[in-house]
Design a protein with these regions (language model features):
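A short, hydrophobic beta-strand-centered structural micro-motif
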Residues: 37-51
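Charged, amphipathic alpha-helical segments and their flanking helix caps
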Residues: 1-33, 49-169
Length: 169
């Protein structure tokens, strides 16, 4: 699996574990929260910190990376208990770090984790955010096992772009 495939597998494992615990918060890749999604939810991202040099396209590569998991929640009213709002966050951290659940087993090895500073976004609704950074290690490949779809000629792509631009004008 490539690093991006590992990242998606980690998100999937987290979402399945959260659903099994009865938690209604879901993890979305960074920048892809669907319209209509409600609080609470997670956004994740990853950053490669080290990739083993001199690997071939056939062999696996030892890769260190950070899995960043940000949690967003908002109180439905001023009377809401902040501690209760962060229960999905605490459950997710426990699911990921606990040797009993081991939700990322077979995908990546968790080396350590750290919390990011908490902050509040104020606007029409006060949004609370907490984050976790997981230092992970895994073996990745350079070749994706996901089928790329069908081939499309460059001329067809250019025609599609021109049509889209023409319709907007």
């Amino acid at each position: 699996m490539t690093i991006i495939e590992k990242y998606y597998a980690m998100n999937k494992a987290l979402n399945q574990a959260l659903a099994a615990q009865g938690v209604n918060a879901r993890a979305y890749k960074y920048g892809a929260v669907p319209k209509g999604a409600s609080y609470p939810y997670f956004q994740s991202a990853y950053r490669v910190t080290y990739r083993q040099p001199f690997a071939s396209s056939i062999s696996g590569v030892l890769t260190n990376f950070e899995f960043i998991l940000n949690f967003f929640t908002a109180a439905p009213s001023d009377e809401a208990n902040d501690a209760k709002l962060f229960e999905p966050y605490e459950i997710a951290r426990e699911l990921i770090t606990s040797p009993e659940s081991f939700i990322w087993g077979g995908i990546a090895t968790l080396l350590s984790h750290d919390e990011t500073p908490e902050f509040r976004l104020k606007g029409g609704l006060e949004v609370l955010q907490r984050g976790l950074v997981f230092a992970c290690q895994t073996v990745t490949t350079f070749v994706s096992s996901i089928h790329g779809g069908e081939e499309i000629a460059v001329d067809d792509v250019i025609d599609t772009i021109r049509e889209a631009l023409h319709e907007e004008v």
